[in-house]
Amino acid sequence: STLTGHLIYKCGGIDQRTIDEYEKRATEMGKGSFKYAWVLDQLKDERERGITINIALWKFETKKYIVTIIDAPGHRDFIKNMITGTSQADVAILVVAAGQGEFEAGISKDGQTREHATLANTLGIKTMIICVNKMDDGQVKYSKERYDEIKGEMMKQLKNIGWKKAEEFDYIPTSGWTGDNIMEKSDKMPWYEGPCLIDAIDGLKAPKRPTDKPLRLPIQDVYKISGVGTVPAGRVETGELAPGMKVVFAPTSQVSEVKSVEMHHEELKKAGPGDNVGFNVRGLAVKDLKKGYVVGDVTNDPPVGCKSFTAQVIVMNHPKKIQPGYTPVIDCHTAHIACQFQLFLQKLDKRTLKPEMENPPDAGRGDCIIVKMVPQKPLCCETFNDYAPLGPFAVR
């Protein structure tokens, strides 16, 4: 959060007076070093614990892009929120701490860094920037050796997880606190020849937007705004959303008309893929809508709930073998729903994805299986081929 907050501040997303106010209040609480993090950690509870719980959305502009930052939690208790944030992103910035012991803990068997990188890959993110952060740490002292060690280890770990292009990613030595290598190259690390963070962001290619497909918008939150009414919010994944449209909220059959669409407090004539929007609907109360519902156009391939679906599942890490009947919570787009693994149909070779065994009795770490899955509550998901953002899911 400190790195992200500093980036937003430097790009003019927040003024100096607010930063000064945050610094004063953070110092009073004995947390002066958290002032930039406070840009994002708006919740009082988060400030007092010094960790990120919710997903903060913030907008800033670079020379090339308007960027929406989704600051997702890195703390284990809040992994569900982290998954929701990741499922809305085009690219990821993975922040690893350079401090002795801190980096090693993150990439250990159950470490956060490894888990986040795995989830980002599973949820369909293709491109990543890695910030080797806290280079100003008293033990690290902007050391090239420490940076090289972390870069080498991260490349190896990312490849093992399934990031085939890990060698092409930018690995940037940064300090969220001092601002080194955020907006411009740092004179404290003359040995580093790559881009600073803002240039790396501008060097990313914007993904192709599926505007030609029917509308799909998974709901992230639902608000009641006085004088306006019920406002669901989320990211348009495919298609377009515009005032006057009749939309359905799957897996229910509730239909409503869109009155207005807003992004970052500006009204839009229409929103397309990648836009994080809030929209006002007629005739529905906040209690009628839930996070995880999917919005679609009533007249154009509207989304529906599914009673069961067939999925390819890779067991990344599980203490013991799983068998049919196993019922974990799955995170699919913004939905979090218990889902039973009813039948194991096939076991596949992980490299070729060719069937190795029909109806395997169980599956363990490293296995790739085809499973018939039954949601325990209504769920709207789609095949990866038809609507790629609504196909991937993570099992926890």
Curated annotation (Swiss-Prot):
One Pfam match: GTP-eEF1A_C
Entry keyword annotation includes Nucleotide-binding: yes
Transmembrane segments: none
Compartmental location: Cytoplasm
NCBIfam families: EF-1_alpha (TIGR00483), PRK12317.1 (NF008969)
Function: This protein promotes the GTP-dependent binding of aminoacyl-tRNA to the A-site of ribosomes during protein biosynthesis.
Protein name as catalogued: Elongation factor 1-alpha
Species: Giardia intestinalis
Underlying gene: TEF1
